[in-house]
Amino acid sequence: MDDDYTRGTRSLPLLEGGFDGRIGLTFLGVGGWLIETPRTQVLTAPLFSNPSIWRTGLGTIRADSTAIVDGLRRFGVDDLSGVTAILSGHAHYDHLMDVPWIAARLSPRARVLVNTTGQRTLAPIADSLGLDRSRIVDVSSFAADVEGGGTWIRLGPDVRLLPLRSDHAPHFAGLTLYDGTRGSDLVRPPRSAEEWLEGETLAFLLEVADAGGGRPVRIYVQDAVAREPWGFVPPRYAPVDLAILVPATYAEVDWHPEAILENTRARHVALGHWENFFAPPSADPEPVAFTLLPDFIARLRRAVSGDDSRWTLPMPGTRLELGRLRNDSR
């Protein structure tokens, strides 16, 4: 199993056409990815505060600014000031708890794109941090599904985003923790994990424009394992070049990752949110509990016909660089 992990930098020859430079993705652990295109930076919601399982279940939890700064530095990121958007498809604490502090202190240009419940949960935290509430945007009404629809959101000169209606698999034995939606703004910051209600989960499709006018690069971001067809892309947007998929809780639904791979026809798969987030951030973490990661990898291998060049299991801090196809001489 240890041989399956990727560390350092991995180059993926996926790009066609006239891209000026590479598209880089740095895995920050849990759901966090820093996605850098030639002209735009986007962050998917990271977690560095990592309260213990006992504190999460029984105590008070909050963002730890020291852990956030140390975690970013540990994984090679020292500047988030250029980030224009922070994405979180649902509002559980392990996705959203650290985001307001990052937006307020490290990413002053970023909009926080969340579901309705996420916006309502973050409202009092934004006030406590001096973060303008207008920067927290509910994108639920922009979402597409497998039948189509939806509205693209511009994130930068070369990047646009399509939210996708998705789902959150049960955590174990058919039970989904912290399920539910929020009908109005919280009046004070959440104190416990159970106050970070999930809301209606979204996935995301990013399109990076080709400077040469060719086909855009498409990156699919799965926020949580979903029952099919939730989280599917409309067929006209397949294939995607890179799909970021979640192994955690895969056994709670049928046909994951097979169904989403059939839908997206992804050329490459990167795995996130696979590690134990009840321990402090580490460059060499253990897999999350209740997930048989070797079994998931075996299923993924079968789904890509045994081609190990088509998937990456990154350790936190790993950087993926999407470059030109080897037969593209331009």
Give the ranges of each region predicted by the language model.
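Active-site HxH/HxHxD metal-binding segment of metal-dependent hydrolases
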Residues: I53, R73-W152, R160, R165-G174
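Binuclear metal-ion centers of metallo-dependent hydrolases, dominated by the metallo-beta-lactamase
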Residues: R111, Q119, A123-L155, P257-R330
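Active-site neighborhood of phospho(di)ester-bond hydrolases with catalytic His/Asp-centered motifs
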Residues: L43-A45, G82-H92, L113-T116, I219-V225, ...
